[in-house]
Design a protein with these regions (language model features):
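Feature marking well-ordered beta-strand scaffolds used for ligand recognition
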Residues: 1-188
Length: 188
């Protein structure tokens, strides 16, 4: 492995103020989506000799942020109270990024981790403890709440087709969940 370039937007030593990283590609360009404890950065990494921040936004203060992308949108969650799901429009990269807004599912305040599979987001842990599904089919900028599975606390999950593999760390187990019906997920 060879380091071909680096950028540290905060100028800190050892990256102590960063919490997660995700990738996004569009129009032949590659981007890093970097979460900081009070910020999110959209970084063009296409040319390792010219790595640059295309956009950054202040976010809810938390040591933990996680993000995923779908279509030309990025979705950011955190464990900060009342952080919901922050939505960013990436359509104008590399020129700019737009903040769409914050979506708060009914009764939802915070999320530990997020997964994406097809036009669905899976919110783990946090307010609901289990998994809350958001549907992006109609309008990715305006998620629609679907089902909730909360038999056990879910720290993180992996979604393969319509099957969820959920880490139930507080219970020392893993759950396998049928998510074919997003409104009524069932344990297999």
């Amino acid at each position: 492995i060879q380091l071909v370039g680096k950028l540290n937007p905060l100028g800190t030593v050892s990256g102590t103020n960063y919490s997660a990283l995700w990738g996004y590609s569009a129009n032949g360009r590659d981007y890093a989506v970097l979460g900081g404890n009070q910020s999110i950065y959209f970084i063009d990494v296409t040319d390792s000799t010219n790595i640059r921040v295309c956009g950054s936004f202040t976010t809810h203060s938390s040591n933990w942020h996680e993000m995923k992308t779908y279509s030309h949108y990025a979705y950011l969650v955190s464990e900060a109270d009342n952080s919901g799901v922050q939505i960013f429009d990436l359509a104008n990269l590399p020129v700019s990024v737009s903040y769409v807004g914050q979506y708060n599912p009914p009764g939802h305040s915070r999320t530990h981790s997020i997964q994406q599979s097809g036009p669905y987001l899976y919110l783990n842990g946090g307010t609901f403890n289990g998994i809350k599904v958001l549907d992006l089919t109609v309008n990715p900028a305006a998620p629609v709440p679907r089902g909730l599975w909360n038999n056990f606390y879910v720290h993180d999950c992996s979604v393969v087709n319509d099957t969820i593999w959920a880490a139930n760390i507080d219970d020392g187990k893993m759950s396998v969940i049928n998510a074919q019906n997003k409104d009524n997920m069932t344990t297999i």
